[in-house]
Amino acid sequence: MALQLIYGNSGSGKSTYIYEKVIQMAQADRRRNFYVIVPEQFTMQTQRELVCRSENHVIINIDVVSFERLAYRIFDELGIQNTVMEETGKSLILRKIAEEKGRNLTVLRGNIRKMGYINELKSMISELMQYDISVEELGDFLHQLKPDSNLYYKLSDVHTMYAAFEEYLQGQYVTAERVLDVLAEAVDDSKLLQDAVFVFDGFTGFTPVQMKLLHRCMHVVKDMYVTVTLDVREDPLADHGIQDLFYMSRKMTATLLRAAQEEAYIVEEPVFLPVGANSRLAQSPVLAHLEQNLFRVRSHRYEENCGEALRIYSLATPREELRFAAWKLSHLMREKNYRYHEYAIVCGDVECYEKYAKSVFELYDIPYFVDTKTDRKSVV
């Protein structure tokens, strides 16, 4: 049983390396289960990559799953039945609790009927669950605050609502944030996970609930492989503070190594993938230079002309930015014979641009997909 970390710059081929490796291992050991665990939005693309790379385009003992899909796979195996409360249900229950506990609330009492307030409260409670902060731990934190501070009163109301919400769920429902807790308790009973191989790709870090699951899996899973985005010139164990470009990668490394040490899980020598001719940016020297030097302490100027590889435009509003991007896409489709699936529009605030996407892209007849979760609209 061993943990191995695969380090490399963005575009250096970490995914390619680990996909080729897991395909070879799966072909050599048909009786072992291999789980490639990726963020939810990458599952279909990863399946496609593995199928295309596999011999005869078939993967028999390799499953591509997210954490949540892995949980339901094991629940099906063990016959575990859980009624998962959806987002609309959470809002309804919190509304009911707010009505019942109204007299005990101080700050929230006057705001609870405002549009969107229940959703904000729901989001906060969901985040507390996701980061494994229990009602008791929140209560302990309250005792450390000054009783006359605004933060104390606000968190006191949140604590009241959180405790009542947990009490309502007890024995009846489980939230999406607690699905991994249920899975962690079932890991030892699963035959699918016994001596399996886990491959984690596309993660920048793990939440405490996910780490709790990994701790339990280290007792039953044969090997774990984790890809980490890190400049190979950097020391993965160095601590340069939160302002460091690769802070999250280093934090994930430290968390995994600490977990392996606590569970007596062997740590193999890491793999460092150099930036070479097969890297994603090899055909674009401008972008390759940018990747190597952007936000680095010791950066170098690109002495040649950037050509068409990099252009900076300034527009007045997000809508105008999106219209320009749509026009540029249409132009490249006609002039360069590119395909829509070869493009991505990356933005810092997806919600801000999402509200203009429908009208702009339909105007230019461009098919599109917005990478956000769409919840059912609450009626409360």
What are these regions (language model features)?
Residues R31-D140, K146:
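Conserved P-loop NTPase-based nucleic-acid remodeling module centered on helicase motor cores
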Residues V58-D63, D365-T374:
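Conserved RecA-like helicase motor-core motifs
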Residues A2-L3, S10-R32, E40, V187-D189, ...:
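Helicase P-loop NTPase motor core
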Residues K377-V380:
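Conserved small/polar residues in nucleotide/adenosyl-binding loops
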Residues D63-R69, V197-F206, Q210, Y225, ...:
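Conserved helicase core region in the C-terminal RecA-like lobe
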